[in-house]
């Protein structure tokens, strides 16, 4: 009889582990992280890029391609803000980070017991196997980004440490923010102006600081995470274009990620003339004709864009159907969480919302106002940053230093810009078209950034 009881207990434990294996692993990871820095790093990556998304996607009816964007986007937004507020109360430390992860484990267990996921892991893997071309594209985007960044951002050689790019001066600032936070600068002040409150949308750097804090000084983490964020951007573009078909979505993803202006002509010219030199050739001309950095270069260097653009693209996908109450709420929540990461994308989300509201005015529903919950979520940061935000009118700013603005836009915005006009009739609905026109014209009317081209 004791043998039977023991056998029954083993069977019950085995079944419980099979049913709750993910919960068990997630519970063990933060605990084991206290004794292993390598496990701590892995845990931070999982909990800040995956776990919150696994929790909250159950509350929204999303398609698989939308979930693949939702999971990393909401994970970064939620985990970073959770740790921020906990750190304000209890202090910023490695232990508080793991305590926040344990809070997420508890929430995951409670939610999982009440709401089933639409997709199982096996189901996702099965569908993923059918989309090998898409997977290959995303893998190539990650590898290309990682190779470029690992050889250009914090690349050590005999002469010192290499940091390059069209906006190379900003990269040290990102490192200063990350390392100063992890060395006691919390709540953070400007690392290069001690005593001045942080006036920069720094939360993407705070996310990197959180991940690094679990391991220790790790400057190569920035190229890795940037590569991951570029893939998230690619996923967001794919999700936005997916209603137009799989082939169109893949094509759009490649063009949006790697498409740039026509400044690469100078690269071909330098190569064919034998004048190419990696140390001196430069695609960007500050306040000159090629004055807008290519989007891929922006994604490599402008870190706030790494989360701002994916959230904006994801919101565009959500706002196409304002009849769906849950998606309207989700768009508002994501927008509200976005503000400390990237203020310009926050404003772009509001511009898209008002366009969608206008287009749906004949079928107005009260739930369409739920998007405004974003203002409540972002309120603490809106109040604290209001003094540092300045809006200036810059009517037709390109005319102030260019003879031919039309040629300037074609040359700098390049292939994606031209294709947008050529195929604008094929885009379903008017929502994306109007948003495109408004956001294209906006930098010619107002500027809220130090440089006008930053508005692009």
Can you say where each PLM-predicted feature lies in the sequence?
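Membrane-embedded, hydrophobic transmembrane alpha-helices
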Residues: 2-128
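Active-site lumenal/periplasmic loops and adjacent helix-entry segments of GT-C-fold
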Residues: 44, 141-311, 343-347
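Membrane-interfacial loop-to-transmembrane alpha-helix junctions, especially the N-terminal start
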Residues: 16-23, 60-75, 131-135, 247-249, ...
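Structural signal for the C-terminal ends of transmembrane alpha-helices
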Residues: 35, 56-62, 107-119, 150, ...
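Membrane-interface alpha helices of multi-pass inner-membrane proteins
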Residues: 297, 327-343
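Transmembrane alpha-helical segments of multipass membrane enzymes and assembly factors
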Residues: 51-67, 88, 236-251, 321-324
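Transmembrane catalytic cores of multi-pass membrane glycosyltransferases
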Residues: 29-37, 170, 271-272, 343-348, ...
């Amino acid at each position: 009889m004791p043998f039977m009881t023991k056998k029954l207990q083993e069977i019950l434990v085995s079944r419980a582990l099979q049913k709750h294996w993910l919960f068990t692993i997630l519970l063990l990871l933060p605990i084991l992280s206290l004794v292993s820095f390598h496990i701590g790093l892995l845990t931070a990556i999982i909990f800040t890029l995956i776990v919150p998304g696994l929790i909250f996607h159950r509350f929204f009816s999303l398609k698989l391609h939308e979930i693949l964007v939702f999971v990393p986007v909401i994970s970064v937004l939620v985990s970073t803000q959770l740790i921020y507020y906990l750190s304000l109360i209890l202090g910023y430390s490695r232990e508080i980070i793991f305590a926040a992860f344990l809070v997420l484990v508890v929430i995951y267990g409670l939610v999982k017991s009440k709401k089933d996921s639409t997709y199982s892991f096996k189901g996702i893997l099965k569908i993923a196997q059918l989309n090998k071309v898409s997977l290959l594209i995303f893998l190539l985007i990650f590898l290309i980004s990682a190779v470029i960044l690992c050889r250009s951002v914090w690349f050590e050689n005999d002469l010192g440490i290499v940091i390059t790019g069209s906006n190379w001066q900003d990269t040290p600032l990102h490192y200063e923010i990350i390392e100063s936070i992890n060395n006691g600068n919390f709540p953070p002040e400007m690392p290069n102006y001690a005593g001045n409150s942080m006036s920069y949308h720094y939360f993407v750097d705070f996310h990197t600081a959180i991940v690094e804090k679990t391991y220790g000084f790790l400057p190569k983490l920035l190229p890795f995470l940037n590569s991951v964020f570029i893939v998230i951007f690619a996923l967001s573009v794919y999700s936005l274009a997916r209603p137009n078909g799989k082939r169109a979505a893949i094509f759009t993803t490649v063009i949006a990620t790697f498409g740039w202006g026509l400044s690469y002509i100078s690269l071909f010219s330098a190569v064919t003339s034998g004048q190419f030199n990696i140390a001196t050739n430069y695609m960007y001309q500050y306040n000159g004709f090629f004055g807008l950095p290519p989007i891929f270069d922006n994604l490599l260097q402008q870190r706030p864009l790494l989360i701002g653009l994916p959230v904006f693209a994801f919101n565009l996908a959500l706002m196409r159907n304002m009849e769906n109450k849950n998606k309207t709420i989700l768009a508002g929540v994501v927008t509200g969480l976005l503000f400390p990461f990237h203020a310009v994308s926050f404003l772009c989300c509001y511009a898209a919302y008002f366009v969608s509201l206008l287009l749906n005015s004949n079928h107005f529903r009260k739930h369409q106002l739920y998007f405004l919950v974003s203002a409540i979520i972002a309120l603490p940061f809106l109040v604290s940053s209001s003094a540092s935000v300045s809006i200036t009118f810059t009517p037709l700013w390109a005319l102030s230093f260019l003879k031919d603005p039309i040629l300037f836009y074609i040359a700098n915005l390049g292939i994606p810009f031209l294709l947008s006009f050529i195929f604008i009739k094929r885009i379903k609905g008017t929502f994306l078209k109007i948003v495109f026109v408004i956001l294209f014209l906006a930098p010619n009317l107002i500027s809220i950034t130090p440089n006008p081209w930053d508005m692009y």
